[in-house]
């Protein structure tokens, strides 16, 4: 929303290209319609009209209709690059910009070309984690948003980094403050939750130990162990052995989840009895299905892999309005 507000105040910011993870595309389109209004030629707000938006979901090359916003996921960029280069884009927005931390990927090369177009006036990157473990991953991102700020990659590494035994460039500890100052001075607006949510209460964590059916778990673990020994005995390659271990690990995780399930259901019921909201995360579809079935009287929203975009969006909306 902050990005949309910024673009609405800038002159000649449209058309804008929004590049984002696949699961957030519909949300971008929804927020555009919710928060932005169309302006008339004389600059007046038109209450009943919104900026137009096109969501690009097909990898097949074809001309793209004119629009105020073009929304596409990172994975389709290189396939639709020729079509996107034809557009008169004025702004490039990269949501979860850490996707561009590797300068050798196809999506990085595509964004680099799009952001370097003569008509592009604004480049915006959004991320909660722009700097990863080594620190040097920030260079490709900054070189798209503000080319030349950190010099060439070689110059950046020579000044800010050392190279470890694996050949990876890592930002020196005594250079971190200097790099942070350079970024916040020229290109990075760092906002903490405490800065933007003044009225939000501090998060409080109460760890609760959930009981489990230990007898069931040990019986399942015994079956998994015997099956693993059998598979290892007849494994012909290192790949077969590795795959067998992975299957055993997944089976153990599911057994642990099933052993806790009745107690988790009781725990959720107790919370619901005092009319509090609950979010439950689970790893396996089988456990998800059992949870959903057992707690169906609360009509819970359910977000899980394999859902259609339409179904997932409907579930997200129902979750928001709970």
Which sequence ranges carry the predicted segments?
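Walker A/P-loop
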Residues: 1-4
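Conserved Walker A/P-loop ATP-binding site and its immediately adjacent core
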Residues: 14-31
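Conserved motor-coupling elements within RecA-like helicase/translocase cores
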Residues: 60-70, 313-319
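Inter-lobe coupling linker of SF2 helicases/translocases
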Residues: 71-76, 82-89, 106-121, 126, ...
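Walker B catalytic acidic pair
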Residues: 95-96
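A short helix-turn-beta junction within AAA+ P-loop NTPase domains corresponding to the substrate/partner-engaging
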Residues: 139-151
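Conserved helicase motor "Helicase C" RecA-like lobe of SF1/SF2 P-loop NTPases
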Residues: 282-305
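Conserved helicase ATPase core of P-loop NTP-dependent helicases/translocases
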Residues: 298-320
């Amino acid at each position: 929303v902050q990005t949309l507000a910024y673009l609405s105040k800038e002159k000649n910011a449209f058309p804008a290209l929004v590049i984002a993870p696949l699961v957030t595309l519909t949300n971008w389109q929804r927020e555009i319609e919710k928060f932005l209004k169309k302006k008339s030629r004389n600059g007046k707000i038109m209450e009943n009209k919104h900026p137009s938006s096109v969501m690009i979901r097909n990898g097949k090359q074809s001309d793209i209709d004119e629009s105020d916003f073009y929304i596409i996921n990172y994975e389709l960029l290189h396939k639709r690059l020729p079509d996107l280069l034809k557009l008169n884009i004025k702004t490039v927005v990269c949501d979860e910009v850490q996707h561009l931390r590797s300068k050798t990927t196809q999506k990085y090369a595509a964004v680099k070309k799009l952001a370097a177009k003569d008509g592009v006036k604004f480049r915006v990157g959004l991320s909660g984690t722009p700097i990863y473990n080594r620190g040097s991953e920030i260079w490709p991102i900054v070189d798209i948003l503000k080319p030349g700020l950190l010099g060439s990659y070689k110059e950046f590494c020579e000044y800010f980094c050392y190279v470890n035994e694996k050949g990876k460039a890592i930002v020196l500890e005594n250079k971190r403050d200097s790099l942070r100052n350079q970024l916040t001075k020229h290109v990075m607006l760092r906002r903490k939750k405490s800065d933007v949510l003044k009225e939000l209460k501090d998060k409080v964590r109460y760890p609760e130990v959930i009981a489990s059916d230990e007898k069931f778990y040990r019986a399942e673990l015994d079956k998994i162990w015997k099956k693993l020994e059998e598979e290892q005995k007849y494994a012909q390659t290192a790949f077969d052995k590795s795959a067998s271990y992975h299957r055993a690990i997944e089976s153990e995780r599911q057994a642990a989840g099933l052993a806790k399930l009745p107690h988790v259901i009781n725990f959720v019921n107790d919370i619901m009895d005092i009319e509090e909201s609950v979010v439950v995360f689970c790893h396996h579809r089988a456990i998800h299905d059992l949870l959903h079935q057992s707690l169906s009287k609360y009509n819970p929203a359910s977000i899980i892999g394999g859902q259609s975009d339409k179904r997932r969006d409907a579930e997200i909306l129902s979750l928001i309005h709970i």
